A protein has these predicted regions:
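N-terminal Rossmann-like dinucleotide-binding module
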Residues: 2-75, 430
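Beta-loop-alpha module in the N-terminal Rossmann-like domain of NAD(P)-dependent dehydrogenases
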Residues: 78-140
Length: 433
């Protein structure tokens, strides 16, 4: 398989995962080891085993719950701190890279603290909860001369690079639209896994948890990226119309659709739900005047205007992709040309998330359209016929309220995104009903 040129993406061949980097062995720190932070711990362990990383420090606030990981971390040579602030004081000026896989509401303050301590940062997606937070991260990053890489993992895969380069090169003609749809049912346990799941706020801090700011955040970010006029930049966003819904007893939406207009006139459509009975993995379709490209979980396909498949590229496996991300951020330490998903790219996603909440309150789906059921010992909730309703809207490039087939749908207002720099734009914003 051909690879993208290093001058653009800095990608490596799939058989060369975590090859020696031109940077010296990087000293790294980690925040947390539970939940998704365990993914980062495993990545760091592989990096240490391959001589790429020196594991210096980790924050573990629940050490009594993670005795085995604490033992393993000590064997790897890292110092364990009980709080993030203590760790930051201990590592100031001593690490090249800090991994921050924490709750969304903690991203901005932790990233900024790590930058001020002289570390580059890899933060899990999204970059932060609000547009003003992402802008502040960007300012501090530039002032401190340190980078921030955001964990929108698919943007580090060669297949998505190929997809965007093909679009930019006119491989599907003039780009007409980019859209995504995904249905991933979630159980009660999903919303009880931590203190912030399904929340719009945690105390005084914005959380804005939702399918499009968490599980399907990758796809929303990708459609913004794919519509960008240059490889390194996402689309510039002009306006958004969103529809946000909840079937569960939560504050945040569990179902959403939105239409985002780019300044270049290309519409971006997005559909997601956690309250379907069926699981339908996410798909992205970029349609042009002379064909289309389709991203799915296993790869990217290029079709001509007659629907004939021209070419296909596979996506990386999970472990391979996580190692590819590490290789990219390690190379970025010494080579500013190495492609990462930085705040400049991730900002479009956060603007879309914030704009969606400006456009629509979170409407309650009436109980008569919802069903509770138990499967494999887990409690689930589903909205009747939502698979067909969302699929029909997706196929027709319509929002749910525009199809005329969804009795509970409520249209949101058009909200302008150009020059949008603060969430919420109005102090009296009504978030849910």
């Amino acid at each position: 398989m051909d690879t993208i040129s290093a001058s653009k993406s800095g990608t490596q061949a799939k058989g060369d995962i975590l090859a020696p980097s031109p940077v010296k062995v990087a000293r790294v720190a980690l925040v947390g080891v539970s939940g998704f932070a365990d993914v980062h711990l495993k990545t760091i362990r592989r990096g240490v085993e391959r001589g790429l990383l020196e594991f210096v420090a980790v924050t573990i606030i629940n050490q009594e719950e993670e005795p085995e990981k604490c033992r393993e971390i000590r064997e790897l040579g890292a110092k364990i701190y009980g709080t993030f602030d203590e760790m930051i004081q201990g590592i100031s000026g001593k690490v090249e890279l800090c991994f921050i896989p924490t709750g969304i509401h903690l991203h901005a303050p932790m990233v900024i603290s790590a930058l001020e301590a002289g570390a580059n940062v890899f933060v899990e997606k999204p970059a932060a909860a609000t547009v003003q937070d992402v802008l502040e991260i960007k300012r501090v990053s530039e002032r401190r001369g340190r980078f921030v890489a955001v964990g929108f993992q698919n943007l580090y895969d060669e297949s998505i690079h190929w997809m965007k380069e093909c679009i930019l090169a006119g491989g599907i003609g003039e780009l007409r639209s980019v859209k995504s749809m995904g249905l991933w049912p979630r159980t009660d346990r999903y919303y009880k896994r931590n203190s912030w799941a399904g929340q719009l706020r945690v105390g005084d801090d914005w959380m804005l948890d939702s399918p499009f700011n968490n599980a399907f955040a990758h796809q929303l970010n990708m459609i913004c990226f794919l519509a960008g006029k240059t490889f390194e930049k996402p689309a510039e966003l002009d306006s958004i119309e969103a529809e946000l819904y909840r079937a569960r007893e939560i504050d945040s939406p569990d179902t959403a659709c939105m239409r985002i207009q780019s300044t270049g006139g290309v519409p971006l459509l997005f559909f997601s739900s956690h309250v379907s009975r069926e699981l339908r993995d996410p798909v992205i379709v970029a349609t042009g005047s002379q064909g289309e490209m389709v991203w799915e979980m296993d790869g990217v396909r290029h079709f001509d205007s007659n629907g004939v498949e021209i070419e296909r590229r596979e996506n990386r496996s999970w472990v391979s992709l996580r190692d590819r991300i590490l290789a990219a951020v390690l190379k970025r330490i010494s080579d500013p040309r190495e492609f990462i998903c930085g705040p400049e790219i991730a900002l479009a996603h956060t603007i879309s998330v914030n704009g969606a909440h400006e456009s629509s309150t979170v409407h309650r789906i009436p109980e008569k359209y919802c069903s509770d059921y138990t499967r494999e010992g887990e409690h689930w909730m589903a909205v009747d016929q939502i698979e067909e309703q969302i699929s029909e809207a997706f196929d027709q490039d319509l929002l749910l309220s525009e199809t005329g087939a969804v009795p509970w749908a409520r249209r949101g207002k058009k909200f302008l995104l150009k020059g949008y720099k603060n969430f919420p734009a109005a102090l009296n914003l009504r978030l849910f009903v």
